[in-house]
Amino acid sequence: EDHFNLDIIPLKLKREEFYHLDTCLVPIDSATALFVESAFDKESLVKLQHGFENLIPIPEDEALKNFAGNAFCPDGHHVVMQSGSKKTMKLLGQLGLEVLEVETSEFIKGGGSVFCLKGMYF
């Protein structure tokens, strides 16, 4: 909280399939995020609606099968995600975002995908 000068807002996940926030929420920029609606309790959904102007739903089948909720947007323009999430990719394209598909199926077997593989530096 102090390092980034941001408020921490707790969100509750209600489904075991979405065991980390990075499996069901992908911030694109300060106004836009992808999310899996069924992963969050009602109170958390309200918080998300207040926090983002644009919430784009990730189809649940793509979140579960392809880890579409584990994508990463480093710059507000490019979204790196596991290949195969055609519906989510179409939604992102309609927003003018460029999707970079990568193959992470071996990492998915261990419970992670793109977001879990990145390294950030500040």
Provide a role label for each language-model segment.
Residues 1-122:
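The feature marks the mature, well-folded catalytic cores of soluble enzymes
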